[in-house]
Amino acid sequence: MSTVIKRPTRACVIGHVKIGGDAPVVVQSMTNTDTADYLATALQTAELARAGSELVRITVNSPEAAAAVPKIREHLDRMNCNVPLIGDFHYNGHRLLTEHPACAEALAKYRINPGNVGFGKKKDEQFAQMVELACKYDKPVRIGVNWGSLDQELLARVMDENSRRAEPLDATEMMRHAMVTSALESAAKAEEVGLASEKIILSCKVSSVQDLIAIYRDLSQRANYALHLGLTEAGMGSKGIVASTAALSVLLQEGIGDTIRVSLTPEPGGSRSQEVIVAQEILQTMGLRAFTPMVAACPGCGRTTSTFFQELAGEVQDFVRAKMPEWKLRYDGAENMTLAVMGCIVNGPGESKHANIGISLPGTGEAPSAPVYEDGEKTVTLKGDNIANEFKQIIERYVERTYTKKLKS
């Protein structure tokens, strides 16, 4: 695993999930269903949890949504899905939590946006009201600052202060400073109201990679609250994945961050679970967590004119991901297994020997056989039309004999 030294933050418990302190970085996701449709929201929440999301955030934006929250929690419990629910509030959270105590109780954490919790004279009053409710129900709070909804009064104030500096900050520096100031001042206000410091999580989300890195570096140096990382509005497909990975990996490598979310825009009709898989793969690729066996595969070249190795790599990845829930219940350590599916003799045997299990498929003009290596030793050579199924059986047998069986409770 990684030698990254995590920066010390205050430990916080969200439902049954510990974040901060000495806890590993936790994966979070968010539903995109209408929360008032409690069944659809419960089903998508369960889907995200099955994919590996350890915390799930849901929008609570109306009386109907607030009334649905306890039903969602109840339905999840009946499905044996104990993932903690986070309520995402904007504008009217103070009223919804007051008028719907069952919602306030069913949620494991509240998200408050200091930029729109209230305006003018009502801002501090409504912020304090939400914090008091968090204290009443013993819930942690994420103070989530977002550049798109930054507190305009605060922004005007810090801009005025900046104009009087001997060396004023430029526009980018001002934006970063305002984001951090909003988060820290809001946290201080929450503590003044009575919320314990270990009940506070901070986030400052922007859509620029460099801005996100600079903001969180500053934030982590100025306070030790638990931090939630995420690049807001990362985008679709490879752009969203690359942008989120570029931002989060730098911060995680520096030991910054206690929870992460990859905010991908899904394809129409696409699975919301993709954001969970990407978050897990970021953490596992960096050696910070282990969730499922990693499959190494070569990119292919002129020596690999057959597409079979590509098809097999995808099939093996799908196989181990599908088997992992069962393996997780039965065995300790299977998530650390490494696999290699290689396409020719150049790097195939070498990469295969370095994995726990590897297969080197024949390239163009090579003998039609595929040697299999287990822990560096060649164990069998596969031939014929059933290589995929035989290789998956080898993986299954390896798991059964290699990893310690868990005792039944």
UniProtKB/Swiss-Prot annotation:
Pfam families: GcpE. Keywords: 4Fe-4S, Iron, Iron-sulfur, Isoprene biosynthesis, Metal-binding, Oxidoreductase. Its cofactor is [4Fe-4S] cluster. Its EC number is 1.17.7.3. It is an enzyme of class 1 (oxidoreductase). Binds 1 [4Fe-4S] cluster. Pathway: Isoprenoid biosynthesis; isopentenyl diphosphate biosynthesis via DXP pathway; isopentenyl diphosphate from 1-deoxy-D-xylulose 5-phosphate: step 5/6. [4Fe-4S] cluster binds at residues 298, 301, 344, 351. Belongs to the IspG family. Converts 2C-methyl-D-erythritol 2,4-cyclodiphosphate (ME-2,4cPP) into 1-hydroxy-2-methyl-2-(E)-butenyl 4-diphosphate. This is 4-hydroxy-3-methylbut-2-en-1-yl diphosphate synthase (flavodoxin). The gene is ispG.
